[in-house]
Amino acid sequence: MALRSPARDYLVSMIGELVGTFLFLFFAFAAAQTANQPNGTKPLTPNATDTSKLLYIALAFGASLAANVWVFFRVSGGQFNPAVTLALVLIRAVSPTKALILIPAQLVGGSLAAAAVKGIIPGDDILFAVSLGPGVANVQGLFIELLLTFMLVFTILMLVAEKTKSTFVAPIGIGFSLFIGHLVGIFWTGAGINPARAFSPALIQASFPSYHWIYWLGPALGSFLAAGLYLGLKEMKYELVGGDADKEKREEGLTVQQADLIIETLRGLPRAIQGSGALGQFEGTTEGHRSPVDLERGAEVRILEDDPHIRKSRYGSPDSTDLPT
């Protein structure tokens, strides 16, 4: 078995973010380029509206993100967005060092996607770049980008950073969030929401508008706002206030015997199994002469036995369905 190392983990994550961002944006850019091909009507830019094209492009971005997050979640986290990575750094889910590796990978992946679409699909013009709509001031565009990014990032934090029984379908919620953001933002700002998405076409066509900075500052501020709200809710223990989505899962809970077996497996410490179903005393130790590990384990036992979510089996006759097989 190959030994894990931080360098190897960083390399795998970097490759995952580069390839994942490339695939996400390639299919999204290609859909936008296809929808905006001249056919007697104007391309869907912030200067003209066409709801059918708007829906097509918004759905393409949302579906492409959902599919690729699902694929790459276990490889790199499926971030594909510097704003998302920033938020994960703020909540301490990703280290700053790792972020400095992932963000350049995202920018490179996005740029390769933009170059691939430009090279593969006929036509000289890039029709998927972002720009402000008519009458939209820079500060207005900034706040639009801030709010759209806030929605996406907060969705990701609540569905992915919070581990629940619905985490496995989180990519659907993330895709819907981006879909909604594009429905709102395409006409007004081009719906950047992602610095890699805004930067890539501008780089390939070597054209950066004077207000390009809003596609970096807006998402960054949105990330700070989303991370701040998330941390605030966690500090206030929001899960104890409203209905608990995971109540059923917790009620199923663990029996004392299951909890005991888990602790024994993790700690590797033998003990005398008592018929009461409680976790008993440690072999070869006394209350006054337990090792630090024993004392720590004893604290865990007391917590588990006092936890109302852990069902205790019948005295001396544990239910066989409660025991691991």
Swiss-Prot record:
Gene3D superfamilies: Glycerol uptake facilitator protein
Location of the motif NPA 2: 194-196
Residue intervals on the Extracellular side: 32-52, 122-140, 189-212
Residues in the Cytoplasmic compartment per record: 1-10, 74-100, 162-167, 234-325
Topology with respect to the bilayer: Multi-pass membrane protein
Glycosylation sites: 39, 47
Induction info: Expression is higher in vegetative hyphae than in conidia and infection structures.
Domain of life of the organism encoding this protein: Eukaryota
Family, as annotated: Belongs to the MIP/aquaporin (TC 1.A.8) family.
Domain comment as written in the entry: Aquaporins contain two tandem repeats each containing three membrane-spanning domains and a pore-forming loop with the signature motif Asn-Pro-Ala (NPA).
Region (Disordered), start-end ranges: 279-298, 305-325
Motif (NPA 1): 81-83
Pfam family, one: MIP
Annotated Gene Ontology cellular component terms: plasma membrane
Catalytic activity: H2O2(out) = H2O2(in); H2O(in) = H2O(out)
Name of the coding gene: AQP8
Protein name (database record): Aquaporin-8
Keywords of this entry: Cell membrane, Glycoprotein, Membrane, Repeat, Transmembrane, Transmembrane helix, Transport
